[in-house]
């Protein structure tokens, strides 16, 4: 390792200084990137925020509701495990559909099913019914696997790809981060049923964004 370090010190690319200088000249401020991509980060980013809020909320509401109807920890574990297993089995099919038909073919069904599942939680008064809700949540999250990362990569401008995706991820994490305090606050001061219906309402807003405002970014430029 010492020899490799010495070699790396004495051997350098003749274009290294030029590339570093070029990157400094073409760098943009975050505010400039936001301004130039205000539709992608503002409008499409709102859809991203909502979808990740719904995705994270399922990890919070399902356990709380399970204990609310008197289920034991092992029953909750089975529900969560089956839901996650279904989620993972859909990774590859979701990617295939995105590349074959378009990004919205996975993101739109995903947010519709997520919203539907949250509307059904209040009626899940038994293990079997909550298991069914968990299955729907697993399917809905699975078919949307990678959709938002792919959408962000499609929308990212070539001259500021990294910073754009950094902002994109920040929006995504913000949606995920809001789920716990939102569900917890509504559940504590009002009711857990109202919390699930509130998430459903937010989901319906997200459906409008994904159906009408989020563009299809798949570009089929290859020859058949």
Question: What residue ranges belong to the model's regions?
Answer:
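Intracellular juxtamembrane helix-capping segments at the cytosolic ends
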Residues: 143-156
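C-terminal membrane-cytosol helix-exit motif in multi-pass small-molecule transporters
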Residues: 1-20, 206-214
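Structural signature of the two symmetry-related core transmembrane helices
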Residues: 105-120
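Helix-to-loop junctions at the C-terminal end of transmembrane segments
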Residues: 90-102, 187-188
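Juxtamembrane intracellular "pre-TM" segments in multi-pass secondary transporters
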Residues: 12-45
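A membrane-interface helix-boundary motif in multi-pass transporters
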Residues: 1, 185-203
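Helix-loop boundary and gating motifs at the non-cytosolic
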Residues: 40-47, 51-69, 75-77
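A late C-terminal transmembrane helix in Major Facilitator Superfamily
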Residues: 161-189
């Amino acid at each position: 390792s010492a020899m490799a370090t010495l070699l790396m010190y004495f051997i350098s690319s003749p274009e290294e200084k030029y590339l570093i200088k070029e990157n400094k000249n073409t760098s943009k401020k975050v505010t400039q990137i936001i301004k130039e991509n205000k539709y992608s980060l503002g409008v499409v980013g709102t859809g991203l925020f909502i979808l990740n809020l719904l995705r994270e909320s399922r990890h919070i509401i399902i356990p709380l509701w399970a204990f609310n109807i008197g289920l034991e920890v092992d029953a909750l574990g089975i529900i969560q495990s089956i839901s996650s297993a279904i989620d993972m089995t859909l990774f590859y099919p979701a990617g295939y559909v995105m590349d074959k038909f378009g990004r919205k073919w996975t993101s739109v069904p995903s947010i519709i099913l997520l919203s539907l599942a949250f509307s059904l939680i209040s009626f899940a008064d038994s293990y079997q019914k909550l298991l069914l809700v968990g299955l729907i949540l697993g399917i809905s999250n699975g078919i949307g696997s990678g959709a938002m990362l792919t959408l962000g990569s499609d929308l990212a401008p070539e001259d500021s790809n990294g910073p754009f995706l950094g902002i994109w991820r920040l929006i995504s994490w913000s949606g995920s981060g809001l789920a716990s305090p939102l569900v917890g606050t509504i559940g504590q001061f009002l009711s857990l049923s109202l919390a699930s219906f509130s998430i459903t309402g937010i989901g319906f807003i997200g459906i409008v964004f994904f159906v009408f405002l989020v563009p299809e970014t798949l570009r089929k430029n290859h020859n058949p």
